[in-house]
């Protein structure tokens, strides 16, 4: 990993939720950690395809937000896994930020 990437990770990652909003962060904070998932995709012809994936949730931005990263297939199965039917092999991410000024989540 290069120096720029290490710097990005060090400012993005947080060890715990921000104390001034920890109670509100519990809504999604309960998912913090690594999860294995079963993916089911339905093809236009009615076919059903199943595969494995993983989701990683973590605190970011001084504990004021939660980020997840979805991976299909699981990281350990890459790069030799054939494309998952219908959806293909992919990464995705979501950032969830609790906004205390409106008492709501921005996703």
Give the role of each language-model region.
Residues 38-42, 71, 98:
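A generic structural motif
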Residues 32-36, 62-69, 102-106:
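Short, hydrophobic/aromatic-rich segments at coil-to-beta transitions
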Residues 1-48, 56, 60:
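Amphipathic/hydrophobic helical signal segments and adjacent flexible N-terminal regions
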Residues 47-50, 87-89:
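Short glycine/proline-enriched turns and hinge-like loops at secondary-structure junctions
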Residues 52-59, 70, 92-97:
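Hydrophobic/aromatic beta-strand elements that line small-molecule binding cavities or substrate pockets
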Residues 25, 67-69, 80-81:
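Periodic aromatic/glycine/histidine/acidic cluster detector
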Residues 42, 62, 73-76:
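Short active-site-proximal "capping" loops at secondary-structure junctions
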Residues 72-107:
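Helix-adjacent hinge/juxtasegments
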């Amino acid at each position: 990993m290069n120096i720029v990437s290490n710097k990005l990770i060090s400012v993005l990652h947080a060890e715990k939720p921000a104390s001034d909003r920890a109670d509100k962060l519990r809504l999604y904070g309960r998912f913090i950690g690594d999860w294995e998932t079963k993916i089911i995709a339905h093809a236009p012809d009615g076919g059903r395809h199943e595969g494995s994936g993983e989701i990683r949730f973590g605190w970011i931005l001084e504990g004021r937000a939660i980020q997840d990263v979805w991976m299909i297939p699981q990281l350990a199965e890459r790069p030799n896994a054939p494309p998952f039917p219908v959806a293909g092999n992919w990464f995705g991410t979501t950032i969830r930020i609790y906004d205390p000024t409106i008492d709501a989540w921005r996703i």
